[in-house]
UniProtKB/Swiss-Prot annotation:
Residues 1-14 have a biased composition (Basic and acidic residues). This is Kynurenine formamidase. Homodimer. It comes from the Eukaryota. It is found in: Cytoplasm, Cytosol; Nucleus. Coiled coil: none annotated. Pathway: Amino-acid degradation; L-tryptophan degradation via kynurenine pathway; L-kynurenine from L-tryptophan: step 2/2. It catalyses: N-formyl-L-kynurenine + H2O = L-kynurenine + formate + H(+). PANTHER family: AB HYDROLASE SUPERFAMILY PROTEIN C4A8.06C (PTHR48081), KYNURENINE FORMAMIDASE (PTHR48081:SF33). It comes from Salmo salar.
Amino acid sequence: MSRWKDMNKDELERQFSPSQWSHRMSADDVIKSHVTALKEGTERARGLAQTLLNVPYGEGEGEKLDVYVPTTTSLDVPLVIYLHGGYWQFLSKEESGFMAVPLVHKGVVVVAVGYDIAPKGNMDVMVSQVRRSVVSVIQQYSHISGLYLCGHSAGAHLAAMILSTDWSQYSVTPQIKGAFLVSGIYDLLPILSTYVNEPLKMTEEVALRNSPSQLVPQLKLSSSNCDIVVAVAQNDSPEFRKQSEDYYKALESTEGLKVTLEDVPNTDHFNIIEQLVDGDYHLTQLLLKMMGKS
């Protein structure tokens, strides 16, 4: 039995309010600090890398990519697609280039994906957009040596949905070598009755078809060659931690999948991803090792 079904609305909302669980500062301050850290990191990245900003991947106004390109003559150039968090209703690609700071030095291309957050976009739209963004990246950058995904929070959900795509409906089948799913939500049912769903307006049917936890058989078909890292913060809420643990167990018990769980000490929902600006950070090192760039 899922614990969340026994919770009253207040407790459920608290469980799915990551800012309430940081040990570093108040809820309001941790969000302000998070946005500042992402913006400052992205500004640094734009100063270090060659950038191609607002590259279209579709017809929509919000369907744009920011590309951070290393100065390298190497033919071994991996590419990481980053999908931002913000509960499908905040943030944008404009503050999502921070992880390029350590990666471009190592000859890695970083692509930050824009998608139409709620209320403009709904869950089906966002999932379709990020899938199409991957197809577009492969078509534009066919020379890369490997394709990797990294997503945080809502972005980890979207990355997991990409891994669970039936690519027969698309013009190409991406060979995704690795994916970092950081503090994500993989079962959308618990958030249906919370404040998170107010702008999203998901029905149970929409939540089910967009829950990676329901799509593990499709992920096995599409992404069996992908190294998957499910990362969770020590100070994520118990329900956020359970989301990662349950999704990891579902993948780990599926024959033929390569998955590890990283329980990152001394982190909360926000600095677990902010620290990817640092080349010495544990998850940065893991990502570089996965790409053969450590």
